[in-house]
């Protein structure tokens, strides 16, 4: 749920939310969260957003006043799903031997359009695939046709390309989704997301020992990095994923959602050159990245 839905129901109340995908929490959220005795979020990114100070304009005086959240916050990450991945090699017959995977709703926040365009530009001379599990709004035939048409429109701009985009659409069970992470021809997970409260598909890919390529900002950093002790006794965070560089910029106009994603809030914009270098690097050095993914999973 999101904080506007929080309601005091008992002497002690706990609010649970995945939080935000941008850098700031709407002021109205802070007011509702302050009614709770404890706030539980899924990532350090979400906790930082709630702890940050937000300046808003006083409706009567026009002056800027500070709105802060001062109640306790606890971070609880998602658990690993204890299930048996379904063998998807027969159900999904891929004619490209090396494939990336991305699972995302096709909307502004996931940045799917840029990811597809940059992928085709980088691999137009290579027999490499991208398996895209997506939908625009619903898992129905009209939605599938819309997604297929958008991919076809992109492909027509590169008539001689060797790479392929494989569309997956429709409802899949958890066992089938986890089967994608274990498919012998699907070798790495990739996303150019603008921001995640946590990033569940990335988490599932990571604990399934799949190499991950991702924008280097927001909630998924909780599980894509490990803490190591230096010889001097200091704790150092080590990234075990391939990071896509980014710039923090205001969200797009079409992504604005008053009371959730307010105008002026920011999120990450993956850099094109960094993305292309990352997918090329993983493609050329997959054994190295698979060993790194195994270390992260352990």
Language-model segments: residues:
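Nucleotide-activated donor-binding/catalytic signature segment of Leloir-type glycosyltransferases, i.e.
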Residues: 141-180, 187-188
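Short hydrophobic beta-strand element within catalytic cores of glycosyltransferases
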Residues: 211-214, 224-225, 231-237, 242-243
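Nucleotide-sugar donor-binding and catalytic loop/hinge architecture
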Residues: 83-99, 122-126, 291
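A short, well-ordered alpha-helix in the C-terminal region of glycosyltransferases
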Residues: 274, 280-281, 288-298
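Donor nucleotide-sugar binding/catalytic pocket of nucleotide-sugar-dependent glycosyltransferases
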Residues: 38-85
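Conserved donor-binding/catalytic core segment of Leloir-type glycosyltransferases
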Residues: 93-110, 116-120, 130-132
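Extended catalytic core of nucleotide-activated donor transferases of GT-like folds
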Residues: 1-50, 176
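Acidic donor-binding loop of glycosyltransferase active sites
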Residues: 179-197, 207-210
């Amino acid at each position: 749920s999101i904080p506007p839905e929080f309601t005091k129901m008992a002497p002690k109340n706990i609010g649970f939310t995945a939080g935000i995908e941008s850098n700031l929490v709407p002021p109205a959220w802070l007011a509702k969260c302050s009614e709770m005795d404890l706030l539980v979020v899924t990532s350090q990114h979400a906790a930082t957003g709630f702890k940050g100070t937000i300046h808003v304009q006083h409706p009567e005086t026009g002056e800027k006043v500070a709105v802060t959240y001062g109640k306790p916050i606890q971070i609880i990450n998602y658990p690993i799903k204890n299930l048996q991945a379904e063998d998807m090699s027969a159900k999904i017959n891929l004619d490209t031997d090396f494939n990336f995977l991305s699972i995302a709703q096709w909307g502004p926040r996931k940045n799917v359009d840029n990811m597809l365009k940059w992928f085709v530009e980088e691999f137009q001379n290579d027999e490499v695939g991208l398996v895209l599990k997506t939908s625009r709004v619903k898992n129905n035939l009209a939605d599938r046709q819309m997604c297929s048409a958008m991919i076809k429109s992109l492909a027509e701009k590169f008539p001689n390309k060797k790479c392929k985009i494989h569309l997956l659409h429709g409802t899949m069970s958890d066992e089938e989704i986890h089967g994608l992470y274990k498919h012998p021809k699907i070798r790495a997970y990739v996303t150019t997301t603008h921001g995640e409260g946590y990033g569940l598909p990335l988490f599932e890919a990571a604990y399934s020992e799949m190499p991950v390529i991702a924008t280097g900002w927001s909630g998924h950093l909780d599980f894509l990095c490990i803490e190591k002790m230096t010889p001097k006794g200091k704790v150092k965070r080590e990234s075990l994923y391939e990071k896509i560089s980014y710039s923090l910029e205001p969200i797009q106009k079409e992504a604005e959602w008053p009371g959730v994603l307010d105008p002026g809030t920011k999120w990450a914009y993956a850099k094109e050159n960094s993305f292309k270098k990352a997918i090329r690097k993983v493609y050329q050095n997959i054994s190295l990245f698979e060993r790194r993914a195994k270390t992260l999973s352990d």
